[in-house]
Amino acid sequence: MSMFCFQCQEALKGEGCTAIGVCGKTSEVSNLQDLLVYVLKGISICQNEARKQGVSRKEADTFIMDGLFMTITNVNFDDSRFIEKIKAGIELREQIKAALENAGAKLPENLPDAATWTAETDEAIHLKSHGEEIRATKTDDIHSLRELIVYGVKGMAAYAQHAANLGFENPEIYAFMEKALAATIDDSLTIDELLALTLETGKYGVDVMALLDKANTETFGNPEVTTVKLGVRKNPGILISGHDLKDLEELLVQTEGTGVDVYTHCEMLPAHYYPAFKKYEHFVGNYGNAWWQQKEEFESFNGPILFTTNCLVPPAQNASYRDKVYTTGAVGFPGFKHVTENAEGKKDYSEIIAQAKTCAAPKSIESGELVGGFAHHQVIALADKVVDAVKSGAIKQFFVMAGCDGRMPNRNYYSEFAENLPQDTVILTAGCAKFRYNKLPLGDIGGIPRVLDAGQCNDSYSLAVIALKLKEVFGLEDVNELPISYNIAWYEQKAVIVLLALLALGVKNIHLGPTLPAFLSPGVAGVLVEKFGIAGVGAVSDDIAQFMSR
């Protein structure tokens, strides 16, 4: 096989991609991603020792975080960026070793290859990336748990980076990420120890989502109930996709007064819920649906597109928008223009704005409105109304349907599930999974919409806060006693950290779909079923009947 990757839900045949990624990444990029993670594990070993000696490097924390983010599904397809990052990682690792030596400390003997391997040429890097020791091909329980931890830490890194971009950091989160990475190449650890580390990963997942929630709300205000337009205006526009709100803010500031409108796409939709962005009259609305429909929607948008994070889908060779796509941050694709920070940490979007002015206005693909903004602060403000609806029987059950969307036909399950839920139920959602049902006419219960959108995938934290608040209000001992069921759709590694966070909070009986992760060995899957009641999804009618009988 020329590659092996099973980190996302669309792994080929439910087993793994071996020639080219279903996501579109080449075998070369896949192998380089694996090698970068390998190098990051080596850096983590050295950084852990340096931390003990008081000579750890802050730039190493950031480097590891950024490097992990680059390897998340649909973030970066540019092999040159990975080669550059690997070279920089080796150099940084050796600098940490030198700092340890200068401090009179010694690294452990018999360091693993990840902490000692070096290369100076692109050829040497490519050669190493094809090595069997780099790939996660084994499916025994130990390796399965290692991959589960790595993917959780990747999701953690993404959320940590968004918070850091806004000036909010937690050194304990960096230290844990490095501890966890190093542990995944420690052959002395037992299955029980790795299971404990998996739950600890979930605990820090809660912490990092709380940190990002704090960063977003203290910077941009608490999300509030908001109506978002789905139509278009006659001005040229820029479409911004991804999750990074700082990038959005900079783009809005720089486009103000230019005659160029700004539209959100996919996971950027919830930005409309934040008070700070409502002052921008040219922040028009949302264009399109979930990430996997971008090839068609980008053609009709006409203007340039800015990717701040995933999910980027490689465009067709003859796509009319190929020369209009810009990337920034961890995102990359060969031939796309990449916007970097200057020395002051600012980004210059003048080129994308200039190009937008030469483009036709977006073509209308739909009309109407969406309502969202039901993050924890807003829902808790409405707590009396919600509690009364539950006590009166108007609301029988809540369904947490957070997570990701994807292109596989079996994801129609989530639309059908939402449509067939009893009228006395309410959906709590976050992430792009919402696009399977947020435009369905599901109505409301006494003025409470039957779909309450908290925001982006990281705002699954809000759903947990809401659940814990309801537990308190109803005087319950266990969050699982609430009339809340969990039917989560996953796709990539941020969904993994959300899942682990829910488990760390004690949530049980989560249904995960549309398929279970390929990286879960039968033994590990069995433990998740036995200890936490994790289950897959089946027929819509059967699943609803099972949920409603609890």
UniProtKB/Swiss-Prot annotation:
Enzyme class: oxidoreductase
Catalyzed reaction equations: A + NH4(+) + H2O = hydroxylamine + AH2 + H(+)
Gene: hcp
Protein name as annotated: Hydroxylamine reductase
A GO cellular component entry from the record: cytoplasm
Lineage, broadest ranks: Bacteria, Pseudomonadati, Chlorobiota, Chlorobiia, Chlorobiales
Any one GO biological process: response to hydrogen peroxide
GO MF terms held by the record: 4 iron, 4 sulfur cluster binding; hydroxylamine reductase activity; metal ion binding; peroxidase activity
Cofactor(s) the protein needs: [4Fe-4S] cluster; hybrid [4Fe-2O-2S] cluster
